[in-house]
Amino acid sequence: EPANDAYTGIYGNFANATGSTITKGQVVYHTSTANQVAPARANAVGTMPAFAMATADVANGATGNFLLYGFVHDSSAFVSLTIGGEVYVSDTTAGDLDATAPADSGEFVQIIGMGMHADKMLFNPQYPMVKVD
């Protein structure tokens, strides 16, 4: 189990060419450019599926470490996860997580992990997505 504000698991290095900083804890999708990522958002298929989480802020034009699978403990970002509850890609804010599945027509539901404690999660992105009609 990781200490507070820590990520443990399998990592990959990817580039940020979004024009802004990808912040620690944001989930990302792979863009159409090799090795580049951007914050995922469940309201459009073009910004999904999420496959990794930033383990630190990654400035525009920089390459950073992204968690592909593992455990995250962050008492400032995760304050109300439900033990055993599913965690989803947000449909309202790019890169964010949500404890509630997207429900509006045209949005995509992707389970990204499971709450292990109020401020800990198992990050385990599931790649099948369901489109809400």
Task: Provide a role label for each language-model segment.
Residues E1-D133:
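Glycine-anchored, exposed beta-strand/edge motif detector
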